[in-house]
Design a protein with these regions (language model features):
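Short Cys/His-rich micro-motifs in 6-15 aa windows
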Residues: 143
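Short, compositionally biased strand/turn segments
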Residues: 16-38
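Short, charged, amphipathic alpha-helical segments
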Residues: 132-140
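Acidic, Ser/Thr- and proline-rich intrinsically disordered linker/docking segments
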Residues: 1-18, 40-126, 147, 151-152
Length: 153
């Protein structure tokens, strides 16, 4: 089972859609889900296939675009939170470096620490030591520490 590191939702109201577009960042792959009134779309991208990740920041919202060579068109999420977009970019950049073999020892240690901590939180939730709300709170606190340490903000 893959470990969910982060998920990013696009704004439904700003995009004028019934359902929001979602990007799930797992430890092995990225999953993009989009739904229309009658159809559901889901795309799975391994980190080895991610060629570019574009982050465009506005005053309030950000736009995220992922380009992979095997896709018909690039994945675009418009009107996402700036903080969430920065964290997703950091995680995806670290994972693509790790899977591409271009990562330094410090980068690999950093991504291992993230995966171990979040994996431990999910394990505690599974054993009913912490609740779902506490899991989200602890994960957000940990991601804020990462954001502060890597100067993503």
């Amino acid at each position: 089972m893959s470990l969910l590191l982060f998920h990013l939702n696009a704004s439904r109201t700003m995009n004028m859609e019934f359902f929001h577009r979602t990007l799930f960042v797992y430890d092995q792959q990225i999953i993009y889900k989009h739904r229309n009134l009658f159809r559901k779309f889901e795309t799975t991208i391994p980190y080895t296939h991610v060629s570019k990740f574009f982050l465009t920041e506005g005053i309030i919202f950000s736009d995220v675009e992922i380009v992979a060579p095997g896709l018909k068109e690039s994945i675009k999420l418009r009107y996402v939170t700036k903080r969430g977009a920065r964290i997703a970019k950091f995680l995806i950049d670290e994972k693509t470096k790790a899977f591409g073999g271009k990562a330094s020892a410090e980068d690999l240690e950093n991504i291992d620490k993230i995966e171990k901590y979040i994996g431990r939180l999910y394990e505690l939730k599974k054993n009913r030591k912490i609740s779902q709300e506490e899991l989200f709170i602890r994960r957000e606190i940990f991601l804020k520490k990462i954001e502060k340490n890597n100067r993503l903000g």
